[in-house]
Amino acid sequence: MKTLLLTLVMVTIMCLDLGYTLTCYKGYHDTVVCKPHETICYEYFIPATHGNVITTRGCSTSCPGGIRPVCCSTDLCNN
């Protein structure tokens, strides 16, 4: 009985994701799971032609530069 219990505990530990990974938006609807060292979600705007802007989103290790950067550190916060 102890062997069965120990086996179940070991299988459970191996199946669990013991590390936390951040999830950020990459596009308007697409999401990406960040690498373990990337702890920031960002969103910033790049000027384009005719007064339009290009929105860039993703994961980073620090808040990037850009026009009006928005940086945060919780899941899907860069929307």
Swiss-Prot record:
The keyword Secreted applies. One of its GO terms (cellular component) is extracellular region. One of its GO terms (molecular function) is ion channel regulator activity. Coiled coil: none annotated. Gene3D superfamilies: CD59. Residues 1-21 form the signal peptide. Expressed by the venom gland. Keywords: Acetylcholine receptor inhibiting toxin, Disulfide bond, Ion channel impairing toxin, Neurotoxin, Postsynaptic neurotoxin, Secreted, Signal, Toxin. Disulfide bonds join C24-C41, C34-C59, C63-C71, C72-C77. It is found in: Secreted. Binds with high affinity to muscle nicotinic acetylcholine receptor (nAChR) and hinders acetylcholine binding to the receptor, thereby impairing neuromuscular transmission. Causes muscle paralysis, spasms and increased respiration. Belongs to the three-finger toxin family. Short-chain subfamily. Type III alpha-neurotoxin sub-subfamily. This is Short neurotoxin 8. It comes from Pseudonaja textilis.
